[in-house]
Every structure is written in structure tokens, then in C-alpha cells.
């Protein structure tokens, strides 16, 4: 899965060169995020005391924001385009790495067409998406943790009174607690996703055979039996996703108001300005969202685990991990 793209001569430039380009664009986005966070303080302090400032100061603030936001939008759009292209190249590398092995074996491999066509595509897309988020989360943590650490001096939190960087620790503890609960709530999802692909593959196989032979295949009793298996598994899957979604939505909504609950009393006591509150809540959101990356992507990670399991079994079945790349009938993309 990784070797076909990152360790082959044909794709090495795409894999590593593209990775460097993506890292560079993420660094630029993170730098702009930090500048926007700094902008919050001055602009919201301006809004808090409008009678003490001139309207020209307001428009200067808007213009400063636009100078940051417009490049951000352009970089973000170009990055998304390039990463989609990057994921497709990865899929292409995996597809043409598997094909010669599959053609050389005599035994039938269950769901081989789905593994090569669908699972390769989804694996590349999900790994690209989550990998991108992981790298960006690390950059945001490096950039915003010192900012939030410094801003924590403006608040006093029960149980964290004598601890430096209290807001950072609150974010970390909340994220770890949320991750543990998410793991418990979603513990059955990977197995259900795997079973779902098994029953879907059996149903799809029957339909494919039925395209050429409708006498011996796609008979009503067989279709009913296969679809009943699909329905049973989907109902279980929907149920488990239902209470997992309930937990994740509840968790995220609570975390939206946490910084305001913590800092609100200080604002009304006059120990901080509105600008500091907004800047701190923004930094808290960035740090917490980075810590909570795996919670917010749990369903995609579940799907990825299922795909990885199927592709690993497929690689073993076709001998991809056991023998050297066959030369006979090898394909070129």
C-alpha cells in the first residue's frame, strides 16, 4: 500500500516531491492562522470601545483581515486541488502494482475487482485526507500552544490554579477524555464496517454473474437471502453510528462554550478585554481541534481500518508480500 507509491522509482518524485509541496502550503496556512489570531485582539478591542476610536480604524482592521484572508483562500483551494491529484496518483500506483500479481495467480480471490477498484481508491483518499489533517494539526499545535500558554495567565481555573498554561492542560485533558470515550462508544464499528463490505461483495458478485446468466443467477430466493444479510448488517451499523454521532456532536458543542465559560467572569470583572477573550477562544479552538483530530475523524478512521484489513488480506492472497514482482504480463500505467 505504501511501498508501491513511496518506494518505487516511477512514483518517488510524485510521492516525496508532492509531500514537500503539501507541507509548504500547510506551513503558509498555519502562518496566516497565527496572524489572524493576532488580528482578533486588536479588532475586537476596537469594537468594544467604538466611541474611543475612529471609523477609519475599523476599515483599516477590515482591510488587514482581507490581506490575510484572500491569500489563505487561494492557498487553501490550490492545496485541496493538488492533494486530490496526489491521492489519485497514489491510487494509480497501487492499482498497477497489484495487477500483475493478480493476473499470475490461478486461484480465485474473493472480491478482487472491488479490492483493486474501490478499496485502492478509498485507501488513497482517506490516508491523504487524514494524513493532511495530522500534519496540519501538528503545525497548529506548535504554533498555537505557546500562544494559548501565554494567554492562560489571564484566567484562573479551579483545579488548575497553580499550574502554568492551564488552558492548554484543559484542552489536553478534555481531548484525551473524549478520545477514550469515543473509543469505547465506537469499539464495534470497525468489525461492522468489515462485515458490511463482505455482504455487499457477495450481493454485487451475484448481480455481476446475473448479467451474463440470468437463469442460474439472480433468482428471487438468492437475492432475498443476500439482501437480508445486507439489511441486517446495515441496521446494526446505523444503530452504532447513531449513538456514536450523538456522543461526538454533544462533545463538540460543549467544547465550543468551554473557553467562554472559563473566561467570561474575567471579562465582566474587567480583568480582560473582549479582544483578549476572542483571541484566547480562537487559540483554544485551534489547540483543542488539533488534540481532537482523531475524535472528529473516528468514522473515517474506522473505514480506513476496515479497508486496510481487506487490502492486507488481498495482498496475501495474490502473493504481493511473498514473491518478487512478476515480469510476465506486467502492466504499464
For the regions a protein language model found, what residue spans apply to each?
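Hydrophobic alpha-helical membrane-associated segments
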Residues: 20-32, 36, 70-87, 173-188, ...
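An intracellular "coupling" helix at the cytosolic face of ABC transporter transmembrane type-1 domains
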Residues: 122, 195-205, 209-254, 258, ...
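Hydrophobic alpha-helical transmembrane segments of ABC transporter permease domains
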Residues: 10, 117-169, 255
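Juxtamembrane "helix exit" motif at the C-terminal ends of alpha-helical transmembrane segments
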Residues: 25-52, 72, 139-160, 254-274
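Alpha-helical transmembrane segments of polytopic integral membrane proteins
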Residues: 33, 37-41, 95-99, 141-144, ...
